[in-house]
Amino acid sequence: MKKYVCKRVLISAFTLFVIVLIMFLLMELMPGTPFNDEKLEPQQIEVLSRKYGLDQPVLTRFWKYLTNTLRGDFGVSYVLAKNMSITDLLANRFPVSIRIALLSMLIGTVVGIILGTLAAVFHDSILDPIVSVISMLGNSIPSYVFALGLMYFVAYKAGLLPILYNAKDSLRSIILPCLALSTTAMSNIARFTRTQMIEVLGSDYILLAESEGNKKVRVIMRHALRNSLIPLM
């Protein structure tokens, strides 16, 4: 077991190193400098490049970048916030990001379970193919495309929700991102719940519970749904 864990850790570390190297080289191959948008004179750009160490050899800068990153020092921002630590920038935006991520997962899980359960219970009706189509579209359409559609129709055309984040109206501001990010999780969970629920509903103990006179809703909620969600958990 230890050998397997060590092997996986080494593979993960090597993969992460390769990704960091590729991203660094791609940034290096991009034309211009981070200061091109400032409309500065060449002499001023040269001074700034020397100040931030951008005039050093590529290998030197990569080694410095790698060692600083391992220490948690990501340098300073050249564009977004002048001379502000990137660590501080990430810290300022992390609470909103984690809130959106958690709410997206919650929405996707709850809605996915509801849709999957309905599709399984009414799998002989038109509701089943409708849920299947929704799941297929949720997996086929990237979340950013869905986000653009929400921004255009819900925010721009209907004016129901803001497009940009507003700290004074943070709750309404994160509704669109949460909906857009929840589509993939919702689709996968709905399809998984449907499959498990159909299998559980055909079990002997479910048929026995129904034959004892229990209401179908009670059987589904207390027996079928609980057991079908065990693999999901």
Identify what each model region corresponds to.
Residues 16-63, 79-81, 158-176:
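Hydrophobic alpha-helical transmembrane segments of membrane transport/permease proteins
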Residues 1-12, 40:
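Transmembrane alpha-helical segments of polytopic membrane transport and secretion proteins
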Residues 2-3, 90-127, 143, 167-233:
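Alpha-helical transmembrane segments of integral membrane proteins
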Residues 76, 84, 132-191, 195:
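Membrane-water interface segments at transmembrane-helix boundaries in multipass membrane proteins
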Residues 46-50, 64, 68, 88, ...:
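Short amphipathic alpha-helical coupling elements at transmembrane boundaries
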Residues 9-26, 102, 106-114, 118, ...:
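Generic alpha-helical transmembrane segments of integral inner-membrane proteins
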Residues 55-113:
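An internal, D/E-rich "acidic patch" concept
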Residues 28, 37, 117-121, 152, ...:
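Transmembrane helix-loop junction
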